[in-house]
UniProtKB/Swiss-Prot annotation:
This is Transcription activator MSS11. Transcription factor that regulates pseudohyphal differentiation, invasive growth, floculation, adhesion and starch metabolism in response to nutrient availability. The gene is MSS11. Residues 51-83 form the LisH domain. It comes from Saccharomyces cerevisiae (strain YJM789) (Baker's yeast). Interacts with FLO8, STE12 and TEC1. Belongs to the MSS11 family.
Length: 737
């Protein structure tokens, strides 16, 4: 046995003689203890004072249990084992050995009664197992060192559990995203969990889906799709896999890319060829793309011609009337009336632009191309999107559309009109020189007719004479719309919601015959049908319209009557009407208003004329509108009765202003008397709005005849000097004030 080092004294042991009896001389050179005959000594882990003694006790127990006698005797003589002694007394008290025994072994040869037959001490362990605690403890440390944490019980009951393996190996150079960090190994890409990728070592089989495109080592992607065989693989030609980006959307570039794709796809499927043909194949790819380009271009041209011929056979061109289409001369057309069906040779007009164009555009372009090749038609350019780049072609196309619609409308009721039965004589006799002039004149007439339809409003009413509409030529679209709406109101046309039927013979009675119905601001109700008047209506008062503002570019383009503003008779009444009453209409004023129109058309501003007009106040129509907040708080609907007089000149002398005031006072007295005769209350409020005085201040006078308001809450406004339709340019802010 080899020389061993003494654990306690670090001395070399030269004794190699092992016998059944222990040595007489101890190796620890400590004082030999004298034991009693009744005492017994044994090795126990319960007496261990530190971890080293605990380990030694379990090692000694392992050697004895497995019959390693020589090793156990040598270990007992050298190691510091925890010893314990049991007295032979009846009490069985356990006593520990002397402190000197803790430092080394003792010579117990002279005490043969206390040792076993083999000269070894017995062991009594508190922590013990079938295979000794030391063996199980060692197996646990071995499993920890090897990374095998599962015991036999777990392996038997969890056979489907996968082993824990590291996700990122130490030799991996790939940049794996963060969302792959917690996935199981079967979900992770193979390159993330395998050896690093390099140009020479990795060639994926199949479609090449098991490599990372973002990997910096995988730069040449085109080589990944090519199989490295003995004679087929060519590294220089693999650069043609990606198309040239400088070509952009050119057809040649796309064809070149598709040629290379087909070539490489065939190389992938082709078997390996011997090395002798490798030199020939290196020279072939330089000639092959040009040859395939020519073949594919020829095939595409043939397909385009076939598609055009099929479209011409399925949808033949209709017969074209040269009068309808001025830009197609009849002498160049076919004898049967059909346009020449010659497939265009120019590649600008191909099958791609046909799908995005109308049939009329296709005909026009084919006509242009056909005559352009013959040198008869003017040249034009067409973009790839199929749109018109020539303004003349655009104008002619819209002229064709407008003329076709106009001719169809004119010949709709003519049964003898048959466009498909034209003969050669008719085409020859048709003049072709004035086609453009006729087309322009027809187009102008068509536009003029549309414009006249917008201006004219049909006045189809019973017992009403039509009045010539004014010619409005130099107004804007907004002014024309306002003019149309005012004419529609004047013509009493039917509303869109059909709430008021067009009955023109029903006219409302006078004001004193109808009581006022509170709570409804709608049109008046005609309760007594016997009181309806059937007087024929007079001239339309809304015809003579002039713009309110002299500046056309003003924000408000309103229209107002020139002199007098008349409304239908219904607005004179104070009665209300339900919403769904079929008897309520908007008739025109009576014939008795003609006198007022004749009087108001005079431009004389004499006081005598004003007096004459004011004396006929019974026939003067009034405007009834809801009152403002200054009126009384009665439950009835208050009205503002406004009597409109002709416009008066602004610059008047002092003497004339005094006379006009006297005349105004006389008019008020006359009005109050007439209101008393008609049955209304004599208490009437008069509001005078006078122009500025010589001092430059405007005055507003309010006079109360008896300081009482009328029963119906109406005011009589004297507007001799206050013309609401001729106050000039004003803004909405002034209107609010």
């Amino acid at each position: 046995m080899d020389n061993t080092t003494n654990i306690n004294t670090n001395e070399r042991s030269s004794n190699t003689d092992f016998s059944s009896a222990p040595n007489i001389k101890g190796l620890n050179s400590h004082t030999q203890l004298q034991f009693d005959a009744d005492s017994r000594v044994f090795v126990s882990d319960a007496m261990a004072k530190n971890s080293k003694q605990l380990l030694y006790a379990h090692i000694y127990n392992y050697l004895i249990k497995n019959n390693y006698w020589n090793s156990a005797a040598k270990f007992l003589s050298e190691a510091d084992l925890p010893l314990s002694r049991i007295n032979g007394s009846a009490s069985g008290e356990k006593t520990s050995l002397n402190a000197s025994l803790k430092q080394g072994l003792m010579d117990i040869a002279s005490k043969g009664g206390i040792v076993s037959e083999d000269g070894l001490l017995p062991s009594k362990m508190l922590m013990d197992a079938n295979d000794t605690f030391l063996l199980e403890w060692w197996e646990i440390f071995q499993s920890l060192f090897n990374g095998d944490l599962e015991s036999g019980y777990q392996q038997d009951h969890n056979p489907l559990r996968e082993r824990i393996i590291p996700i990122l190996p130490a030799n991996s150079k790939s940049n794996m995203p963060s969302h792959f960090s917690n996935l199981p190994p079967n979900v992770i890409p193979p390159t993330q969990n395998s050896f690093p990728v390099s140009e020479e070592s990795f060639r994926p089989n199949g479609d090449g889906s098991n490599f990372n495109l973002n990997d910096p080592t995988n730069r040449n992607v085109s080589e990944r799709f090519l199989s490295r065989t003995s004679g087929v693989y060519d590294k220089q030609n693999s650069a043609n896999f990606t198309p040239d980006t400088a070509i952009n959307s050119d057809i040649a570039g796309q064809q070149y890319a598709t040629i290379n794709l087909h070539k490489h796809f065939n190389d992938l499927q082709s078997p390996a060829q011997p090395q002798q043909s490798s030199q020939q194949q290196i020279q072939q790819p330089q000639r092959q793309p040009q040859h395939q380009q020519q073949q594919q271009q020829q095939q595409q041209q043939q397909q385009q011609q076939q598609q055009q011929q099929q479209q011409q056979q399925q949808t033949p061109y209709p017969i074209v009337n040269p009068q309808m289409v001025p830009h197609i001369p009849s002498e160049n057309s076919h004898s049967t009336g059909l346009m020449p069906s010659v497939p265009p040779t120019n590649q600008q007009f191909n099958a791609q632009t046909q799908s995005s164009m109308f049939s009329d555009q296709q005909r026009f372009f084919q006509y242009q191309l056909h005559h352009q090749n013959q040198g008869q038609a003017p040249s034009f350019q067409q973009s790839q999107s199929g749109r018109f780049d020539d303004m003349n072609a655009m104008k002619m196309f819209f002229q064709q559309q407008a003329l076709q619609q106009n001719s169809l409308q004119q010949n709709l009721g003519n049964q003898n009109y048959q466009s498909n039965t034209r003969n050669n004589t008719a085409e020859e006799t048709t003049p072709t020189n004035d086609n453009n002039a006729n087309g322009n004149s027809l187009l102008q007439e068509h536009i003029r007719a549309r414009f006249n339809k917008m201006k004219t409003i049909p006045q189809q009413m019973k017992n009403q004479n039509t009045v010539a509409n004014p010619v409005v030529s130099d107004i804007t679209s907004q002014q024309q719309y306002m003019h149309m709406m005012m004419q529609r109101m004047a013509a009493n046309q039917q509303l869109q919601n059909s709430a008021f039927p067009p009955d023109t013979n029903r006219i409302a009675p006078a004001n004193n015959a109808m009581p006022l119905q509170p709570g409804n601001m709608g049109p008046p109700v005609i309760e007594n049908p016997g009181m309806r008047q059937t007087n024929p209506s007079g001239q339309n008062p809304m015809i003579n319209m002039q713009p309110l503002y002299q500046n056309v570019s003003s924000a408000m383009h309103a229209f107002a009557p020139q002199q007098q503003f008349h409304l239908p008779q219904h607005y004179k009444t104070n009665t209300s009407v339900p919403q769904n009453d079929s008897t309520s209409v908007f008739p025109l004023p009576n014939n008795n208003n003609n006198n007022n129109n004749n009087n108001n058309n005079n431009n004389n501003s004499n006081n005598s004329n004003n007096n004459n007009n004011n004396n006929n106040s019974n026939n003067t129509p009034t405007v009834s509108q809801p009152s403002s907040k200054r009126t009384s708080s009665s439950s009835t609907t208050p009205n503002i009765t406004t009597t409109i007089q002709p416009k008066r000149k602004q610059r008047v002398g002092k003497t004339k202003t005094k006379e006009s005031r006297k005349v105004a006072a006389a008019q008020k007295v006359m009005k109050s008397k007439k209101l008393e005769q008609n049955g209304d209350s004599a208490a009437t409020n008069f509001i005078n709005v006078t122009p500025k005085d010589s001092g430059g201040k405007g005055t507003v006078k309010v006079q109360n005849s008896n300081s009482q308001q009328q029963l119906n809450g109406s005011f009589s406004m004297d507007t001799e000097t206050f013309d609401i339709f001729n106050i000039g340019d004003f803004s909405p802010d002034l209107m609010d004030s």
